[in-house]
Amino acid sequence: MVKHIWDSERAAQLPKGVEELVYRSNLIGSDRTVCNWGGGNTSMKTTEKDFRGREIEVMWVKGSGSDLATMKAHNFSGLKLDDIRPLIKRDQMPDEEMVDYLSHCMIDSKHPRPSIETLLHAFLPYKHVDHTHPDAIISICCADNGKQIAEDIYGNRFVWVPYVRPGFTLSKMIAEGVANNPHAELVLMEKHGLVTWGETSETCYQKTISIIQEAEQYINDRINQHEVFGGKRYQPLPEDKRKQILAGIMPVIRGAVSEEKKMILSYDDHDDVLEFVNSVQAPALSQIGAACPDHLVHTKRVPLYIDWNPETQDVHKLADLIKSGVETFTSEYQAYFTRNQQDGDQIFESAPRVILIPGIGMVNTGKSYAMSKVSGALYRRAIAVMKGATALGQFVSLHENESYHVEYWPLELYKLTLAPPEAEFSRKVALITGGAGGIGSAACRRFAAEGGHVIVADLNIEGAQKIAGEINDAYGKGRAMAVKMDVTKEEDVQSAFERAALAYGGIDIVVNNAGLATSSPFDETSLKEWNLNMNVLGTGYFLVAREAFKQMKHQNRGGSMVFVGSKNSVYAGKNASAYSSVKALETHLARCIAAEGGEFGIRVNSVLPDAVLQGSAIWGSSWREERAAAYGIEPDQLEEHYRKRTALLVNIYPEDIAEAIAFFASSKAEKTTGCMITVDGGVPAAFTR
């Protein structure tokens, strides 16, 4: 049940004007059962002074593409009402003309483009107006007997408006319906949503919430009298079993849905999702259509339902069904586009955004983790709507042609243009070992800065969490995650890749960077020291690369590995035989994997740094003293010593190595594998030959 959370004390402290609207909007948007992500809109009418100092009536309305839950004052657009109100006398107004007209009504050209539904707010005579998409209300609006149900709940207090796409015509229909019903307190838009109003921001909010609560109570009473979704077809698998299966199957799904463009995945196994996917009605009900027009751009018209029996069929069968299911969905989506397209339309990715798997839950796809979560959140709202609608009558949706025209509607697509452009590592996932160290953290930041999703793997979990937290703060929740990994432990490495699969669907880039270093004259090198170097830098690189290779093969979309070697990979360092030997091993292992990985599109290259002291745990250890002693200098003279021995007379920093790593991982090096790059300022003894 939605809750009334208006705080009168806080509201009283707000400046009069737009901040009141911001507060109300944030409250409404904070409950996704009331308002979809990015959907709905709010408004208020005020008196302002124009640039001449004259008082004019202004309507503040949500700007297109913003989200009620998080929007601020600058996300609203102010429009001159005296310029808008005369439009109601017109008989029609095409979308393009409406958008152009409203641009001339804005009090400030720097304001965002006003909402598609601006006229709906302007044509109603009330000071405050809310348009929302509550689950309970849409359940009524998407029931075949919805109008009758509305009469049972609201009597003569509502206006029912048949489905019309948002714009001038719908706005005029709503205004006329309200004007013709003196008892009207709300508008129900068929297959769409709710409109409410009030003379103060608080009374408008109260009306929105109370109207929804009435619907919820009515629907809950009916749900309790029915077998939800026709009853259970399957039992959900135990949680640990679900995760075990998903860890192996997510890369298969990711590969299947990434035929055209790479996708980031997320999964959802909330109780409401499991109730739906395991139900008798799910196979048919899920294919009827979208529960709300606002869902279409993010969920497509229907999900992919995998008809897998979790009680009798194995994971291999599930993988086969996913591959064939995605292939069928893709061809059907392309046919859907062809049947309905208009001049200028460009097809989206054909792969499903929502995949329903009995016993397991829901997998969602998107260009980023955030957008895959949006698809999932919206489909959970669709499940709630279908649950309510089927308790009232039959669930109905838009016809195919109208669904298409909403999905490809220029006014809806405009919102997508407001997102930042994709960068080099957008849609990709990079796992970096030693990610909390100097080079590792620089690589993590470099990938994130160009759109990548980053898994910061390190034995130092606190350091890894710090780096991941910084990335999420800078680029958004879900862009990075930290995993504890001891690269010498097979179970740690396998667990990290399983977590990568569960979090994002798999990996595209792996940077083998975890390291240490020791220094001893050869005849004083102990077996313990030798094994330590071999375990971390040899076995560790092998284990990480092997698990990466497996996951990349399962995805069947190629991939890139970058080994961080050393100048010592090609140069025999004095008093460092164990370290230098295993660094040579690393680069040859990289070449061996490159030779095997080519047929799968898996590239493997190496970056050979030298003397990267900044932020390095290695150089903060006894290694600094040991190397200084080897050169007969003081530890604090080491950095200058290294600079002077380079041909370019430069110091090398973590960001320099990160740049080379990024190059090998990028499309710029898509035809390069088995290669090495030295980033050492030019140490003649380490010139590759």
From Swiss-Prot:
A molecular-function term among this protein's GO annotations: oxidoreductase activity
Protein name: Uncharacterized oxidoreductase YuxG
UniProt cross-references to Pfam families, sorted A to Z: adh_short, Aldolase_II
Entry-linked InterPro entries: Aldolase_II/adducin_N, Aldolase_II/adducin_N_sf, Bifunc_RhaD/ADH, NAD(P)-bd_dom_sf, SDR_fam
Lineage of origin: Bacteria, Bacillati, Bacillota, Bacilli, Bacillales
Gene: yuxG
SMART domains given in the database record: Aldolase_II (SM01007)
SUPFAM superfamilies: AraD/HMP-PK domain-like, NAD(P)-binding Rossmann-fold domains
Binding site for substrate: S566
E.C. number: 1.-.-.-
